[in-house]
UniProtKB/Swiss-Prot annotation:
SUPFAM superfamilies: dUTPase-like. It comes from Anaplasma phagocytophilum (strain HZ). InterPro entries: dCTP_deaminase, dUTPase-like_sf, dUTPase_trimeric. This is dCTP deaminase. The gene is dcd. Catalyzes the deamination of dCTP to dUTP.
Length: 185
């Protein structure tokens, strides 16, 4: 399994609808860069945010998750409080082919401000808008920007197709259209 180059990503994005909308170049003048890079794709952050807030003194329980754990915000940016957490989604819709596995990494600009981006792998056969998890590890508030680069996706092509894809397995996060909270099925 190898990380795939720009021309391969572009071909699969256009031919298979792997990324939509697809920006076939790196856009970075005056913004956090996004679009196609040499061995990845920098996705953009949408403008709807869910910020962890302890307004109701709830315990975060992944088996019994409460919407009360979050405050919803919408706008051109979001300020993540110190040592806090925020959920958002990508502008781009991903449709992962059956022979591809995708891993997400953070952007160095945000990392240097104390932001860690975490996304579990996009499995073969998965499709939807990606829910992004941002942790502010700094002791200061950090601003993140909507419609600008938020993370980079790396694409790995398997030597052969998997026996059972995410969609065939009935994956619980299949077809996400908005920020999706934890689901226990």
């Amino acid at each position: 399994m190898s990380v795939m180059p720009d021309h391969w990503i572009k071909e699969r994005a256009l031919k298979d609808g792997m990324i939509s909308p697809f920006v076939d170049h790196k856009e970075g003048t005056g913004v956090l860069s996004y679009g196609l890079s040499s061995y990845g794709y920098d996705a953009r952050l949408d403008n709807k945010f869910k910020i962890f807030a302890n307004t109701h003194s709830v315990v975060v329980d992944p088996k019994n998750f409460s919407q009360d754990s979050f405050v919803d915000r919408e706008g051109d940016f979001c300020i993540i409080p110190p040592n806090s957490f925020m959920l958002a989604k990508t502008v781009e819709y991903f449709n992962i082919p059956r022979d591809v596995m995708v891993v997400c990494v953070g952007k160095s600009t945000y990392a240097r401000c104390g932001i860690v981006v975490n996304v579990t792998p996009l499995e073969p056969g998965w499709s939807g808008y990606v829910t992004l998890e941002f942790s502010n590890t700094s002791p200061l508030p950090v601003k993140v920007y909507a419609f600008e680069g938020a993370c980079q996706f790396l694409f790995f092509s398997g030597k052969e197709r998997c026996s059972k894809s995410y969609d065939e397995a009935g994956g619980k996060y299949m077809g996400q259209s908005d920020v999706t909270l934890p689901i226990i099925s």
